[in-house]
Structure formats: structure tokens, C-alpha cells
């Protein structure tokens, strides 16, 4: 068997997340069906992670195993002809059999986009804050995250995680215009809803609803009910996966 990595991106607006769902169309199902049609065999793929409903990916990786070698450029071309316009395949390449799209990934990077002035051209891919935000204080909060490893406070209640420990490599706010920013976070792994809950908590900080000391306490106690809300998925992008 030969293992292949597929590198692709998607606009998640029309999908119920990455993972196959019984009552909604997923990115995984759409890509698997296209591969199965072209290769004339049932194909199963494994993704680098699971994005939720409405979340996008500028870079996602998945792997599949095939008994016969394929022409990667030709398959890439055929997939892009068959897939809907909101999914695009960049590249397909053979990899060692011990490479795994999910478990071999060392770092994943997400960005969450926010704007503070009404803008019809940003509304589908950025969260419009109805409140003024103190981004200097939010940057202090982002820096604080790198000093912690247990993020139970930002994990969806009832999620089946074996551990809530994560290593944060990068956590920062980046200003892109006088009224738009994005939060960028890179970690070895992410918990369910972790990025959206993190942003929701940093927004509480930016609104002066909580203090840096409160954020420290929330992280140490690991109480999800004390943290901020899970922000809408339409403004969240999986930006990169590193191996």
C-alpha cells in the first residue's frame, strides 16, 4: 500500500465541519466521494484535524492509502474539476507509510478574524464586535497563554478528551487595519472549541469585563463556565499544519 498526503483548502460556510456527519454534508464526505468516483473504488481519508461547522481551512492535510501508484498531478487536476468551487486541492504527494495526517503533525496554526466597524465585505469571514476592544490588554492575555499548558477552561463541556494539556508555541494579536485584527495561535494540539473559547475569553478581557488576574485564575481553575463564550465559527481559519 502507498500512502499519499493531500494538501487542500476550503470555505467551510456550506459544510457541517470536516468530519462525516449523519445529518449534514461535511468536507471529508465531499472529498472522499470525489476520490471514490475518480479512482473507481471506495476511498477513506484521515484529516489533520476536525474543524467545526462553518470553520474554514487555508491549509488542510489528509492522507489516503492506495494499493496502486497514481499520477499525482493528474489526480489533483481531476479532483479540482469534480469538487465544488469551495474546495481546492493544491497538491498530492506520496509519503512514507508511517506518516499520519493527524498524529504526525507537530504544529497547527489557527487565525480568528475580528473587525470593530461595520463592513459588508468582512461579515462572512470576520466577527464584527459591537463593543470597543482594548487590544493592548488582549495582547497581554495572548502572551499569558504561552505560560500555561492545561486548557480545560477552554474545552467544550462533555468533550471526550483524554487530556487537556496543550503546548502553545505562538499566541498573538495582529492588526491589519485601523479597525481589523486577527488572533493567531499555534499549538501542538487543540481541544474541542478551544480557539473560539479562547477568543471569547480574550474579548471579555478587551471589554474590561475581566482582568489579567481573572484570566490567570480561569486558566488555573479550568472551569469552562468562568471563561468566555465560544465565538461564531465563520471567522475562524485553520491556517497551517506543520510536519
Residue ranges and their predicted role:
Residues 1-243:
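Structured-RNA-binding interfaces characteristic of tRNA pseudouridine synthases
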Amino acid at each position: 500500500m502507498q500512502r499519499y498526503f493531500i494538501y487542500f483548502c476550503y470555505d467551510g460556510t456550506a459544510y457541517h465541519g470536516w468530519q462525516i456527519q449523519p445529518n449534514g454534508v461535511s468536507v471529508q464526505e465531499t472529498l472522499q466521494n470525489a476520490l471514490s468516483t475518480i479512482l473507481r473504488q471506495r476511498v477513506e481519508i484521515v484529516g489533520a484535524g476536525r474543524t467545526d461547522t462553518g470553520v474554514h481551512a487555508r491549509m488542510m492535510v489528509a492522507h489516503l492509502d492506495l494499493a496502486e501508484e497514481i499520477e499525482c498531478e493528474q489526480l489533483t487536476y481531476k479532483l479540482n474539476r469534480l469538487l465544488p468551487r469551495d474546495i481546492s486541492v493544491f497538491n498530492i504527494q506520496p509519503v512514507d507509510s508511517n506518516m499520519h495526517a493527524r498524529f504526525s503533525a507537530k504544529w497547527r496554526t489557527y487565525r480568528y478574524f475580528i473587525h470593530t466597524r461595520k463592513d459588508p465585505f468582512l461579515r462572512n469571514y470576520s466577527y464584527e464586535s459591537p463593543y470597543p476592544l482594548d487590544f493592548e490588554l488582549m495582547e497581554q492575555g495572548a502572551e499569558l497563554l504561552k505560560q500555561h499548558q492545561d486548557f480545560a477552561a477552554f474545552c467544550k463541556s462533555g468533550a471526550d478528551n483524554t487530556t487537556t494539556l496543550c503546548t502553545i508555541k505562538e499566541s498573538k494579536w495582529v492588526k491589519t487595519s485601523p479597525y481589523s485584527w486577527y488572533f493567531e495561535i499555534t499549538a501542538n494540539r487543540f481541544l474541542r472549541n478551544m480557539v473560539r473559547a479562547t477568543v471569547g475569553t480574550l474579548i471579555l478581557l478587551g471589554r474590561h469585563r475581566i482582568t489579567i488576574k481573572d484570566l490567570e485564575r480561569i486558566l488555573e481553575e479550568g472551569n469552562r463556565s468562568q471563561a468566555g463564550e465560544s465565538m461564531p465559527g465563520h471567522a475562524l481559519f485553520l491556517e497551517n499544519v506543520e510536519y
